[in-house]
């Protein structure tokens, strides 16, 4: 008899799954605040790239990573999901 629900086991789910589970159950004000902080970071990053004339390079790199460096891209996205989930959990 297994007393643990495998769907609840954070060790078998992905960072993406964990984030969405946490974001659905956490205080929505905190979730929204952390999401907005992440978008602010993205906006500043884009501004820096624009100021340096690198916005086209960003699109090229994104296409290249999707095509040839998929694991690296997934790892980077997973780190962002982990960061968001951690920021939410530490405030609840």
Locate predicted features.
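Short, functional C-terminal segments
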Residues: 1-7, 12-18, 22, 82-92
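Long, leucine- and charge-enriched amphipathic alpha-helices
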Residues: 9-60
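Charged low-complexity stretches with an acidic bias
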Residues: 57-92
């Amino acid at each position: 008899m297994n007393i643990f629900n495998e769907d609840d086991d954070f060790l078998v789910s992905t960072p993406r799954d964990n984030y969405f589970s946490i974001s659905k159950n956490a205080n929505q004000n905190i979730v929204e605040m952390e999401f907005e902080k992440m978008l602010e970071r993205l906006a500043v990053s884009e501004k820096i790239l624009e100021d340096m004339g690198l916005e086209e390079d960003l699109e090229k790199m994104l296409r290249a990573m999707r095509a040839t460096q998929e694991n690296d891209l997934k790892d980077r996205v997973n780190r962002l999901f982990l960061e968001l989930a951690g920021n939410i959990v530490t405030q609840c």
